[in-house]
Amino acid sequence: MPQTEQIHQHSVLRDIIRSRRSIRKFKQEPVPSAVILDMLETAKYAPNHRVTEPWRFIYVSSETGKANLINTFAAFSKKSKPDMTEEKLQNFKNTLGRVPGFLLVVFQEDENERARDDDFAATSSLIQNLQLLAWEKGIGMVWKSGKILYDKEVHQAFGLQDNERFAAIIQTGYPDEAPEVKKRTPIRDRFTEM
């Protein structure tokens, strides 16, 4: 490949990385599962020590699937915050109801701590690849985490095995609005040469 093309491709990639935003407000149309699958086929080329490919995915975008997810997440919220009012719980459910699709990223937890760390890092790299590919296609995502990722009842609701857990819950759809770029610390302030 000629050097000028390499520079141009680098510039396109740099622009995608710098412009990508976490999207929290979506249009109602879900992203077709074929588009999600296509992006995952490319995203899977994330660095992965020993090529274990520890991941699998659950895409929830049907009305029935979303209703089950919302009820499962609401039950978890009520259990983890017993003083949550019915009004706050309903607001939580309404917020989830406005999300057109959820991609649940699952990975196998190796018994070996180092292998487990490697696999989680690989899965996280895949997720970032996916977010960049989505942004390039005009698809928005927000990567969610928290205590819900570790809850055994939530695991059971989605058919996770004993050696699996969630790496992320990714809300996905076509952006209704994108937030402004947030100021980032110059990397020189966090860079040491030895």
From Swiss-Prot:
Class in the EC hierarchy, top level: oxidoreductase
Cofactor: FMN
UniProt entry tagged with the keyword NAD: yes
Keywords assigned by UniProt, alphabetized: Flavoprotein, FMN, NAD, NADP, Oxidoreductase
Disulfide bond entries: none
Pfam families linked: Nitroreductase (PF00881)
Domain of life (superkingdom): Bacteria
CDD domains membership: YdjA-like
UniProt KW Metal-binding keyword: no
GO molecular function, one term: oxidoreductase activity
Protein name in UniProt: Putative NAD(P)H nitroreductase YfhC
Source organism of the structure: Bacillus subtilis (strain 168)
Gene encoding the protein: yfhC
